[in-house]
Swiss-Prot record:
RuBisCO catalyzes two reactions: the carboxylation of D-ribulose 1,5-bisphosphate, the primary event in carbon dioxide fixation, as well as the oxidative fragmentation of the pentose substrate. Both reactions occur simultaneously and in competition at the same active site. Although the small subunit is not catalytic it is essential for maximal activity. This is Ribulose bisphosphate carboxylase small subunit, chloroplastic 1. Residues 1-13 form a transit peptide. Keywords: Calvin cycle, Carbon dioxide fixation, Chloroplast, Photorespiration, Photosynthesis, Plastid, Transit peptide. The basic functional RuBisCO is composed of a large chain homodimer in a 'head-to-tail' conformation. In form I RuBisCO this homodimer is arranged in a barrel-like tetramer with the small subunits forming a tetrameric 'cap' on each end of the 'barrel'. One of its GO terms (biological process) is reductive pentose-phosphate cycle. Heterohexadecamer of 8 large and 8 small subunits. Belongs to the RuBisCO small chain family. It comes from the Eukaryota. GO terms for cellular component: chloroplast. It is found in: Plastid, Chloroplast. Pfam families: RuBisCO_small (PF00101).
Length: 136
């Protein structure tokens, strides 16, 4: 008899995230990079919820960092440059992914994230990395 909690056979297939050399970003950051189909499905989910897609990119650091203070601050790496305007009225996930491709073409060494805004409640509902630079 054991006192260890187990979820059965699945315990054998669980992995530990390597803590060295791996930065955490946004939602889904513990998973491998999204394939094109997975990216389309995430954007489709965002649109199905009625959220407005918006793209942002960051050239230097794609993660939260403490540059000005040792304790966390709201401005340290959280604000990125917006790519064009939010995509109000967009209903096609392929259109959003095409814009991601445009950001990557213009700034290949940038981190690119997709954000979904609820324009009624005026809040950000989802945010995930759509592209990480080759050098990362």
């Amino acid at each position: 008899n054991t006192d260890i909690t187990s979820n059965g056979e699945r315990v054998k297939c669980m992995q530990v995230w390597p803590p060295i050399g791996k930065k955490k970003f946004e939602t889904l950051s513990y998973l491998p990079p999204l394939t094109r189909d997975q990216l389309l499905k995430e954007v489709e989910y965002l649109l199905r919820k009625g959220w407005v897609p918006c793209l942002e990119f960051e050239l230097l650091k794609g993660f939260v960092y403490g540059e000005h203070n040792k304790s966390p601050r709201y401005y340290d790496g959280r604000y990125w440059t917006m790519w064009k305007l939010p995509m109000f009225g967009t209903t096609d996930p392929a259109q959003v992914v095409k814009e991601v491709d445009e950001v990557v073409a213009a700034y290949p060494e940038a981190f690119v994230r997709v954000i979904g805004f609820n324009n009624v409640r005026q809040v950000q509902c989802i945010s995930f990395i759509a592209h990480t630079p080759e050098s990362y």
